[in-house]
Amino acid sequence: MTELQVDPAASADPAAAADTPRHPAATLPPDSVGLVVPERMHFAEPLPLRNGSQLVGYDLMVETYGTLNAERSNAVLICHALNASHHVAGVHAEGEVGWWDNMVGPGKPVDTNRFFVIGVNNLGSCFGSTGPMSPHPQTGQPYGARFPVVTVEDWVNAQARVADRFGIRQFAAVMGGSLGGMQALAWSLMYPERVRHCVVVASTPKLSAQNIAFNEVARSAILSDPDFHGGDYYAHNVKPKRGLRVARMIGHITYLSDEDMAEKFGRELKAEDIRFSFDVEFQVESYLRYQGDKFAEYFDANTYLLITRALDYFDPALAYEGSLTRAVAHTRASYLVVSFTTDWRFAPARSRELVKALLDNKRPVTYGEIDAPHGHDAFLLEDARYHALVRAYYERIAQEIGA
């Protein structure tokens, strides 16, 4: 573990607190990276954004695991998905375990005995990096609706500045699942000389019309909440929880497979018999309401709007008349692409589309399609075949760089 300069104002990750187990530091398993403390990195230089504006002065929350070698060649960047953060692995003092702790740690597929792993919380998030909840430099009040719309490309440019701070010229690998996979892909396109390997898990080179539609319905639920106040609800000391609940319920349905939902809930009733009401009747309804309530307590509505819109906008083929083959022609990285058979949010066909474009350009690609019942969320879960594939790939990287 590298020593970090700690900002006492850095908060724990509520996403991890809500969705992952807690472990008192004294009972941590031996394959944990242990107790971790995030670092707040401040950047004074303005960051040009894709929308033509710029962000003047911003913070990024960062966590690191493992040790950066003398050559600075063993660094791995982990990019997070919608509601995750910089807290990838290990445990915070409050007991929150990192969102990909089963993947990153000593002896794990991404082995911190060999690699220096970095997690960065993206701009616009609500877990410490500059976002809608942060004070606007001119007013001192939260940005709210004035926070600029950001894109995957903006996040990658910000992450590149983190790499510069560490003196990392090239990552051994950039890795992510779902939206994190889009960032990993974008890294290989925007900074081809800085990415040795690109690991894209349960992701897609662009959203389908159906996925954009899901995001629009979720955003509409938030925007129509009377407590939204045009995005400036902080001043009213309220939160659009009703909209956030519905948005999360919609999203959560897409993260699970039909098989998984059938096995977990089926048509099981909450009570012994139907009650002929519009209250909760089925266990699956109870589960969705629970997930919605939990999410609304810790997540920020403006952040949800920003991140789902960034998902919508990502389409590297757009600048090449829709040709993904042309879009990836200048990449230099080797790739590992992983999909899951029951993932209908980002179906295997989308991963195969990326693989084909890379093969058309004679890029080295390893592709794994894992037969797993858990839908899109499978990328977060511990599956022996999935982890064996990732472990073998990182073993190859370690041998290449002598880690």
Curated annotation (Swiss-Prot):
Reaction(s) catalysed by this chain's protein: L-homoserine + succinyl-CoA = O-succinyl-L-homoserine + CoA
Gene3D superfamilies: 1.10.1740.110, alpha/beta hydrolase (3.40.50.1820)
GO molecular function: homoserine O-acetyltransferase activity; homoserine O-succinyltransferase activity
Record domain AB hydrolase-1: where: 74-383
GO biological process: homoserine metabolic process; methionine biosynthetic process
Annotated source species: Ralstonia nicotianae (strain ATCC BAA-1114 / GMI1000) (Ralstonia solanacearum)
UniProt xrefs under Pfam families: Abhydrolase_1
Name of the protein: Homoserine O-succinyltransferase
Sequence similarity: Belongs to the AB hydrolase superfamily. MetX family.
Pathway: Amino-acid biosynthesis; L-methionine biosynthesis via de novo pathway; O-succinyl-L-homoserine from L-homoserine: step 1/1
NCBIfam families with a match to the protein in the record: homoserO_Ac_trn, PRK00175.1
